[in-house]
Amino acid sequence: MTIQYTFSMIKPDVIKRNKIGQVNTYLENAGLKIVAQKMKFLTKYEAECFYDEHRARPFFNSLVEYITSGAVVLQVLKGEDAITLNRIIMGATNPAEAKEGTIRKDLGESIEANSIHGSDSENSAKREIKFFFSKSEIIE
């Protein structure tokens, strides 16, 4: 097994319902260590740049509007096979299709308001971590 870093973003629906701690408990109980975390409001420009790979998709504008509708919590997670492990504990994108006991099944409200974003590959993790965090913000 390989120790990896991955990126996670707790979405506005979770923040508004005061469930940040609950999400962190899922992550930590799965064996992931939170090595960086900060809360912020994304600007429209930041959201557009972050989700640039989806720019041509029909849901892009709605996604940007949603993710800028409230605060988000940005995180760097560390652990054995952290990218895959985080994807498993998050659950399927659509909460209605997610397995019981996953973050999205238990806390997600819709495909868009599905509680959490997580990197889907090593390249995505590197890009997404670098987008929001400097090396000095990641505490080992």
From Swiss-Prot:
InterPro entries named in the record: NDK-like_dom, NDK-like_dom_sf, Nucleoside_diP_kinase, Nucleoside_diP_kinase_AS
Keyword Glycoprotein (UniProt): no
Active-site feature positions: H117 (pros-phosphohistidine intermediate)
Reported cofactor(s): Mg(2+)
Keyword Translocase: no
Keywords: ATP-binding, Cytoplasm, Kinase, Magnesium, Metal-binding, Nucleotide metabolism, Nucleotide-binding, Phosphoprotein, Transferase
SUPFAM superfamilies listed in its UniProt record: Nucleoside diphosphate kinase, NDK
The reaction(s) this protein catalyses: a 2'-deoxyribonucleoside 5'-diphosphate + ATP = a 2'-deoxyribonucleoside 5'-triphosphate + ADP; a ribonucleoside 5'-diphosphate + ATP = a ribonucleoside 5'-triphosphate + ADP
PROSITE patterns (alphabetical): NDPK, NDPK_LIKE
Localization per Swiss-Prot or TrEMBL: Cytoplasm
EC number of the protein: 2.7.4.6
A GO term from the CC aspect: cytoplasm
Positions contributing to ATP binding: K11, F59, R87, T93, R104, N114
A molecular function (GO) term: metal ion binding
Principal subcellular localization: cytoplasm
BP GO annotations: CTP biosynthetic process; GTP biosynthetic process; UTP biosynthetic process
Task of the protein: Major role in the synthesis of nucleoside triphosphates other than ATP. The ATP gamma phosphate is transferred to the NDP beta phosphate via a ping-pong mechanism, using a phosphorylated active-site intermediate.
Family note: Belongs to the NDK family.
Subunit structure: Homotetramer.
Designated name of the protein: Nucleoside diphosphate kinase
Gene: ndk
